[in-house]
Amino acid sequence: MQPDEKEIVKSELLVVTGLSGAGKSVVIQSLEDIGYFCVDNLPPILLPKFVELMGQGNPSLQKVAIAIDLRGKELFKSLIHEMDLIKSNSDVIVDMMFLEASNERLISRYKETRRAHPLNGNGQRSLIESINEERELLTEIKSLANYTIDTTQMKPKELRKRIGDYFNKSNVQTFNINVTSFGFKHGIQMDADLVFDVRFLPNPHYVDELRPLTGEDEAVYKYVMKWKETNIFYEKLIDLLKFMVPGYKKEGKSQLVIAIGCTGGQHRSVALAKRIGAELNESFDYNVYVHHRDAHVESGVKHKDEKN
């Protein structure tokens, strides 16, 4: 680089969409708090013009987040076409985040806020019908996202922390790996890219002194790891993940969600997720996060997110 040349830093655009009630407002507020210029409910047809403005070097538009939802139902249909257009702009880095949650959680949130669903403005259909229609309409949009977050088990504080972990950084492009334990009886991890079932492993639930503990406790961890089948499975899975992870990054994904499931999400999946997260953190120069979704549901112990 010549002395009088300045390094060109590309502007960044994050399009935030997803199911109504899944947390778009929390995400936009969180991004605004860390310095993003945020726009709520921009019609998709205006995206190319907005990206053109970003590419002109306006410092206030260096990092932009735009929330788009189905309130303008007919206008929303053009989003896929507009996303193809703006991703061809070499001056701006374009990402998409998709937020989702289970029907039960969305219904609960709507009952708490007493707001009408955007697809039920005339009040002539049930809430669940509106949610199901929206989920179907967004199926193709979801496939475009390189960030997908399932907020079913998240409180607003936890979602804000996740957004901060992802985006409160320098302009260096990063790759995030989320290793999540969960219990099948509480529902599958909806935003998972990879799901592994460890219910075939010996279960600490049937050991009286281990039953109230979680896989984060040393006694449970040692119990799960002492079995031959556990270690064979672990070694094979780590080999597979070390092969797959670079491929996901090469294909342009910004995050990879690996979900480890057992019956209740308290013992086996927690122990395996903890060990897998530690190994991936040692093996890759990426951000690795470990989250135990259901451990607190079964044990009564409040869970915490870990960053390796």
Curated annotation (Swiss-Prot):
Key word Cell cycle present: no
Chain sites annotated for binding ATP: 18-25
GO molecular function term, any single one: ATP binding
InterPro entries xrefs: P-loop_NTPase, RapZ-like, RapZ-like_N, RapZ_C
Keywords annotated in UniProt: ATP-binding, GTP-binding, Nucleotide-binding
Binding site for GTP: 69-72
Domain of life, per lineage: Bacteria
A Pfam family matched in the record: RapZ-like_N
Keyword field contains Disulfide bond: no
Summary of the function given for this chain in its UniProt record: Displays ATPase and GTPase activities.
Family the UniProt entry places it in: Belongs to the RapZ-like family.
Protein name: Nucleotide-binding protein SSP1952
Species lineage: Bacteria, Bacillati, Bacillota, Bacilli, Bacillales
